[in-house]
Amino acid sequence: GFRRLTEGGTVYADSRYDYLQTTTPVSLATLTTGAMPSTHGVIGSRWVDYTTNRTVELTAGRKGPGAYHLIAPTLAETLLRHAPDSRAVTIAPEAVSAVVTAGHGGEVFWLDSARCDWVTSPYYAAEVPEWIARSNRERYNLSYISGEWRTLLERGRYLNTRNYDIALSGKSKKDKDQSGSGRLKLRSDFERMLYTPAGNTAVLGLAKQAIAQYRLGEDKIPDLLNVCLDSPRRISEAYGPESIEVEDMYYRLDRDLADFLTFVFAQVKDGSVTVVLTSDHGTSPAFDAGAEEADRF
């Protein structure tokens, strides 16, 4: 998946964000509007309004999650303004990611934390389309969730050394390094979805359904599909970038991307689709990385 993009496309290895803080909503707004935070108005998921001394929630409003505080037009909005017959679809696990990426228009879907269903809000539509409602009724997302997370590859093929909850293939569950620390308790379907590679698989699965249901890219009118993957950030924050959990997630994401790209290029004529893969921020070594980082200084 990643190799197909790097070898078949253009890689901008020195790109960076010229501001702080590069949190997810801030940088997603920058990516989708092309504007700096001082222009697009998103400075965090919440902040304190110094004129009222009240906390402002980025996406909270009377009509449910929406782009109430995003003041610059997004790519989706601009496309729909100039080509009203286009479709702009945005899919993300988290409401904030979906809302900020989409802006004020288009079809926007995210995961409900209670039932793991795909939902939208009255800000965008009265209800989800029937093909999503049917998937929700059939509890299709639960098919992605497993009670156990086991490494995709044999333990010896991993470069990272830390593991907490993941089961190491090729070792007995009784082995000490496989017992896990219980650092992250996955008590709900929503957590099992977003704190494991299943989150990526589910999002890309819905993206494929959207392409098929809406027949995106099949005519001369341009369409836009925004896909946000929040699970890599959540897994990295939960386990640390040096963890086997993070490394395994990227191996699985590579396969998910390969499957998704194969599907996309099978549906759309060659040369008539542009794929952009980017990130809202990077990561830093864990605070307790210790001796592994000592040789940097």
Regions inferred by a protein language model and the residue ranges of each:
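Short secondary-structure boundary/capping segments
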Residues: 1, 103-114, 239-247, 282-297
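Metal-dependent active-site segment of extracytoplasmic phospho-/sulfohydrolases and closely related
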Residues: 252-294
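Stable alpha-helical elements in mature extracytoplasmic
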Residues: 2, 24-28, 71-75, 203, ...
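His/Asp/Glu-rich, glycine-adjacent segments
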Residues: 35-221, 229-237
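A structural signal for short, well-ordered beta-strand segments and their strand-loop junctions
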Residues: 14, 87-93, 226, 276-278
